[in-house]
Amino acid sequence: QVPFAPRPVIPGAFVPIVSQNFDLNGVDGSYTFSYESADGSARQESGVVNAPGTPLEAQAVQGSYTYVGTDGVPVQVNYVADENGFQPVGNVVAPAISRAVAAQVAQARAEGPILPGVPTPIPFRGRPF
């Protein structure tokens, strides 16, 4: 065994996708997608661009995912990701972690940029090629 090497991932049985949907609105940057697998795992997400064309333009996403953990317990996570960061809520997300993330976002917002004069990144516009 090699020290500090990652354990190999041994794929399990093939799990078919029983439903899927993807809709991209190339005009305003909004999208939705979802899928469900035969093993009961699923994911859905939708996103919109808030304040388009302004300095406050930002992608806002909300969604959820579910699966059965290795211990047989169903896992469900709902989330929002926006200008306030990634905010997960679910039966595997400890409330203390959610509070710590919220505190970090508030602190970063209060502190402002690390270096004055560093340009603001250009917002990502998820458009097809």
UniProtKB/Swiss-Prot annotation:
Q: Which residues form the Chitin-binding type R&R domain?
A: 28-98
Which domain of life does the UniProt lineage start with?
Answer: Eukaryota
Q: Which InterPro entries match?
A: CHIT_BIND_RR_consensus, Cuticle_Struct_Prot, Insect_cuticle
Q: Name one GO cellular component term.
A: chitin-based extracellular matrix
Q: Does the keyword Cell membrane apply?
A: no
Pfam families hit by this protein:
Chitin_bind_4
GO terms for molecular function, please? structural constituent of chitin-based larval cuticle
Glycosylated residues (UniProt): 120
Residues annotated with Pyrrolidone carboxylic acid modification: 1
Q: Which UniProt keywords apply?
A: Cuticle, Glycoprotein, Pyrrolidone carboxylic acid
| Purpose | Component of the abdominal endocuticle.
Q: What is this protein called?
A: Endocuticle structural glycoprotein SgAbd-9
Report the source organism. Schistocerca gregaria (Desert locust)
